[in-house]
Design a protein with these regions (language model features):
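C-terminal accessory/tail domains of diverse enzymes
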Residues: 1-181
Length: 181
């Protein structure tokens, strides 16, 4: 939630897949199991398969695909050329108030894409956060710890990101209004 807007949750403009329905993570695991293993060059997967497998899972609570956190409407829809632009909309990212903050976000996303291209993320199971999702990640401490883990993993993979580059993001998302002595 470090880069999200102020409005989050199942009725927001970009809900996470696991914020609305309890069974969505299980269904997503089933969908992911239909893709060939990473690095399996022997199995060709048509680009439109991603759209067909994930379209009804990456939705908001009303079934709207355009309001999901990850919107694949323009990735590779078999229904027409306007849906075959190769675009993945990451709708949960709020436009930061400064261009340099935007550049830091873009650098982070490029590093993550490059890292996952080399070594796809393939956990045995997805995490079922339940209500702990908002209980934890609305607090700056847990967001900071989670972000530090991401930056550490990227650095270990050879991407020289620095956590300090994102200090303005933390100040913006979690402003300090006072201190108790």
């Amino acid at each position: 939630y470090l880069f999200s807007g102020l409005f989050i949750g199942p009725t927001s403009q970009s809900p996470r897949v696991d914020e609305a329905r309890n069974d969505s993570v299980y269904e997503l695991e089933i969908a992911f199991s239909q893709f060939p293993p990473a690095g399996d060059a022997d199995r060709y997967v048509a680009p439109w398969i991603i759209d067909r497998v994930l379209r009804n899972l990456l939705i908001d609570s009303t079934g709207n695909t355009h309001r999901a956190e990850f919107c694949i409407d323009k990735l590779y829809s078999p229904e027409g050329t306007s849906g075959r632009l190769g675009l993945l909309e990451m709708r949960a990212f709020e436009m930061p108030p400064h261009a340099q903050m935007s550049l830091a976000q873009q650098l982070l996303l490029r590093a993550l894409i490059a890292r996952f291209w080399r070594k796809p993320y393939a956990p045995e199971r997805l995490v079922r956060w339940g209500t702990e999702l908002h209980d934890r990640f609305m607090l700056p401490y847990f967001v900071q710890q989670d972000f530090e883990d991401v930056v550490s993993e990227l650095r270990a993979a050879g991407y020289p990101l620095e956590s300090a580059w994102f200090a303005p993001h933390f100040e913006f998302r979690f402003p300090v209004h006072g201190r108790i002595a």
